[in-house]
Amino acid sequence: MKNKSKKRLILAFSMLLALLSLPSCLKKDDTTILINNPQDIPLITGFLPSDLLAQFGEQNVHFGDQPPVIDMEFVSQHEYVSVTTSAPSFPPPGTVSPIAHYHKINQQYLQIAEYLSMSSEEAYCNVISPVYLTGHGNDFTVYYHESPQTDGSPEHAVLFSGTLTADGVKNFMYGYKILRYNDSVVPITAYPVNTIFVFKDRDGLAEKTNWYNDSLVHR
């Protein structure tokens, strides 16, 4: 009887240790990403306008619920691919923008991340959270809505995609649609609502870099 009691005590103690160690197994580390509740992830086909997805190109949208783990800073140089406006101020396709675009993705869960962006013309970066990811293998697509930052600035539906490599993001594509402006006065220099822009990186690789520090965040 004593041996049976001792065995039960050892078994109970082992189960207690297992339960106590469980939370540490669920924490995010370099090799572990929490599994999302699928209800938390809006489908890209319902979240973004269909005409934006069509203009971006189905071949450039990477579908799947197993995107790569992304924790990277990279920079892209945009080349104009297409735009759905005849505004004379818009450069023709093939024109490379002189403005560098900086990106940082901090993946918090399998399909949810914090995204930080800045252009070489800005003094601080924009923090957008959450953004959503879809993809498989090393191919991914990030998609989100960007709210107006100032009076007269637009709300955008945005996506960008590519293939994660050790050097950055290969086959980088970026597109957005102007959904609305946040006040009744639209600047005369602004592009009209529903305009869609699509860009690619000028040499096909948005290069890995280190650009971010806390002082760049607008508080």
Where is each model-derived feature located?
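Short, hydrophobic/aromatic-rich segments at coil-to-beta transitions
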Residues: I70-E73, L110-L116, G135-Y143, K170-F172
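Short, surface-exposed coil-to-beta transition loops
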Residues: T95-I99, C125-S129, G152-F160, F172-Y174, ...
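N-terminal glycine/threonine-rich, aromatic-flanked beta-hairpin/loop signature
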Residues: Y80-P130
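Bacterial N-terminal signal peptides that target proteins for export
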Residues: K2-F13
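C-terminal motif of bacterial Sec signal peptides marking the signal peptidase cleavage site
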Residues: S21-S24
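Glycine-rich, aromatic-bearing surface loops/beta-hairpins
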Residues: A157-R219
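Amphipathic/hydrophobic helical signal segments and adjacent flexible N-terminal regions
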Residues: L26-S89, G204-R219
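Generic short beta-strand segments
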Residues: V75-V83, S117, T141-Q149, Y174-Y181
